[in-house]
Amino acid sequence: MRLLFSALLALLSSIILLFVLLPVAATVTLQLFNFDEFLKAASDPAVWKVVLTTYYAALISTLIAVIFGTPLAYILARKSFPGKSVVEGIVDLPVVIPHTVAGIALLVVFGSSGLIGSFSPLKFVDALPGIVVAMLFVSVPIYINQAKEGFASVDVRLEHVARTLGSSPLRVFFTVSLPLSVRHIVAGAIMSWARGISEFGAVVVIAYYPMIAPTLIYERYLSEGLSAAMPVAAILILLSLAVFVALRIIVGREDVSEGQG
């Protein structure tokens, strides 16, 4: 019976892993049979400009999420207050809103006649700031929840000891809470960055231009077909995978160094 249960677990796990892996692997592998088109896309300056714009916008949105999301994550992990569940619901709201709806909502606020866009010196519609706010909107819940989990995993008694030794709350935060939560914070930042790169629905509503990679892939698919979209999609998959693995390795090495120290 135990062997049967283990086999069932392995089978079901393999099916879901295959479901995730097969489309990605097929997209990349098929470029071996269409290598000329892949090289053409890989040597196209317009493609690289779009890819760099995508990564740059996602990086900015991630930095904003870290700066403003970390304090909120700490509050949610450490404090109890009336309406806390409401705040947590607001944080998770972008997860359940369809992304085209999110784009419309952002347009209402950041559009040229919107609540913020009407008087802001920044232009959001069809501009880089619009891409950033769209990426930030859909990715910030990932970062906040991951950072909150990190802060919650820190033994509160360590903070109390630091306070009894005369450290201020701010010093305790930066010398105890933050360092002990850094693995979750880095993981949250990586996932937030990756989520920003993959965003399409919200971005295309508020800022079709300048193009990001998902928008370019969509446009080429509509105008030229699947064969034209696949090389760019494969490039984005390979680059994102390389960066993601590199960041994971860096984080893993830091964990090993801390363990040896």
Curated annotation (Swiss-Prot):
Alphabetic keyword roster: Cell membrane, Membrane, Molybdenum, Transmembrane, Transmembrane helix, Transport
Region entry Gate 1, spans: 93-107
SUPFAM superfamilies: MetI-like
TM ranges: 3-28, 47-76, 86-110, 124-154, 185-209, 231-251
Location of region: Gate 2: 193-203
PROSITE patterns linked: ABC_TM1
Gene Ontology BP, a term: transmembrane transport
Keyword Transmembrane helix: yes
Pfam families xref list: BPD_transp_1 (PF00528)
InterPro entries: MetI-like, MetI-like_sf, Mo/W_ABC_Transporter_Permease
Assembly notes: The complex is composed of two ATP-binding proteins (WtpC), two transmembrane proteins (WtpB) and a solute-binding protein (WtpA).
Family to which the UniProt record says this protein belongs: Belongs to the binding-protein-dependent transport system permease family.
Protein name, as recorded: Molybdate/tungstate transport system permease protein WtpB
UniProt organism field: Archaeoglobus fulgidus (strain ATCC 49558 / DSM 4304 / JCM 9628 / NBRC 100126 / VC-16)
Gene from which this protein is expressed: wtpB
